[in-house]
Amino acid sequence: MARIAGVDLPQKKRIEYALTYIYGIGLTTSRKILDRTGIDYNTRVHELTDAQAATIRNDIQENVMVEGDLRKKVTLDIKALMDLGSYRGLRHRRGLPCRGQKTKTNARTRKGKRKTVGAA
């Protein structure tokens, strides 16, 4: 089983799609990695040689921020926005959408379960 960046990749999938199981790697990044390493998109994960898996591992380690490091960076970036007191930081702190969506009727995912107000 190919294990790259701490993630077990599905054996029967093509490598270009299997790499997207790693947090921080989408289809575009996956294709760029395969272009740099010279591996065909259509290769299945179980067909990869140890050398090819090692080149993919090295390329990801050198060029792409993935998994724990990326999650930590995103969390710290959001925390920095909140500490600055910017509008986006305030929206994060209040648990509301940050990107301009209306909140009068929607935004249930971000706001959570309804709280009944004024029920007698």
UniProtKB/Swiss-Prot annotation:
Span list, region Disordered: 93-120
Domain of life of the organism encoding this protein: Bacteria
One Gene Ontology term of the molecular function aspect: rRNA binding
A single BP term in Gene Ontology: translation
Cited Pfam families: Ribosomal_S13 (PF00416)
InterPro entries (alphabetical): Rbsml_uS13_C, Ribosomal_uS13, Ribosomal_uS13-like_H2TH, Ribosomal_uS13_bac-type, Ribosomal_uS13_CS
Keywords: Ribonucleoprotein, Ribosomal protein, RNA-binding, rRNA-binding, tRNA-binding
Gene Ontology cellular component list: cytosol; small ribosomal subunit
PANTHER family: 30S RIBOSOMAL PROTEIN S13/40S RIBOSOMAL PROTEIN S18 (PTHR10871), SMALL RIBOSOMAL SUBUNIT PROTEIN US13M (PTHR10871:SF1)
Family matches, as HAMAP family: Ribosomal_uS13 (MF_01315)
Quaternary organization: Part of the 30S ribosomal subunit. Forms a loose heterodimer with protein S19. Forms two bridges to the 50S subunit in the 70S ribosome.
NCBIfam families cross-referenced by the UniProt entry: uS13_bact
Function: Located at the top of the head of the 30S subunit, it contacts several helices of the 16S rRNA. In the 70S ribosome it contacts the 23S rRNA (bridge B1a) and protein L5 of the 50S subunit (bridge B1b), connecting the 2 subunits; these bridges are implicated in subunit movement. Contacts the tRNAs in the A and P-sites.
Family per similarity comment: Belongs to the universal ribosomal protein uS13 family.
Protein name, per record: Small ribosomal subunit protein uS13
Organism: Sulfurovum sp. (strain NBC37-1)
Classification lineage: Bacteria, Pseudomonadati, Campylobacterota, Epsilonproteobacteria, Campylobacterales
